[in-house]
Amino acid sequence: MKNNSQLLMPREKMLKFGISALTDVELLALFLRTGTRGKDVLTLAKEMLENFGSLYGLLTSEYEQFSGVHGIGVAKFAQLKGIAELARRYYNVRMREESPLLSPEMTREFLQSQLTGEEREIFMVIFLDSQHRVITHSRLFSGTLNHVEVHPREIIREAIKINASALILAHNHPSGCAEPSKADKLITERIIKSCQFMDLRVLDHIVIGRGEYVSFAERGWI
């Protein structure tokens, strides 16, 4: 009964003020529902976040990392990974069905949802129309832990096929550091030059790391 009564606090706060009013601890407690023997759910949620550093660290962790957290078994781990996958698919559907005008923040959040946690480098492209509305997005190339082979010709071929006018490039660094490499800068220059011949504009190239990102446009490189 103690765990259930303590869970009412986040629930009541959510119903009164909205889900965004909850702290990370309260939101996690709402999901966990119950604590463990001798530990209420809010305490358990607090300890989990402290152990993993943040919600990001928690949702991108592997099962082996949960072995030191008492009260978290396979079922809860599977549920947590399910939440992360739901978020990724939500952004996927939103981008595909709403065809929104992209803000820098929405673009970053979408790309983080798609590329965070990947064990290999993935290179993807968001294709936009002349009004910078999303037409579609595609994972065009996949590579190894620290390298992905990118072919500008294939990017342009796909853009022409769907009548795109602008592109946003993106790839991840599984190592966690989002700082672009020399190779990242060189391939970006190659893609931009190739696109110019076809009247295609590259708006940005965003590199996704672990909890961080680098935007070529924000740094003035595009």
Swiss-Prot record:
Pfam families associated with the record: RadC, UPF0758_N
Span of domain MPN: 100-222
GO-annotated biological processes: proteolysis
Motif JAMM motif: positions: 171-184
GO MF annotation list: metal ion binding; metallopeptidase activity
InterPro entries registered for this protein in UniProt: MPN, RadC_JAB, RuvA_2-like, UPF0758, UPF0758_CS, UPF0758_N, UPF0758_YicR
Positions that bind Zn(2+): 171, 173, 184
Domain of life where this protein originates: Bacteria
Keywords assigned: Hydrolase, Metal-binding, Metalloprotease, Protease, Zinc
PANTHER family membership: DNA REPAIR PROTEIN RADC, UPF0758 PROTEIN YEES-RELATED
Family: Belongs to the UPF0758 family. YicR subfamily.
Xref: NCBIfam families: PRK00024.1 (NF000642), radc (TIGR00608)
Annotated protein name in UniProt: UPF0758 protein YicR
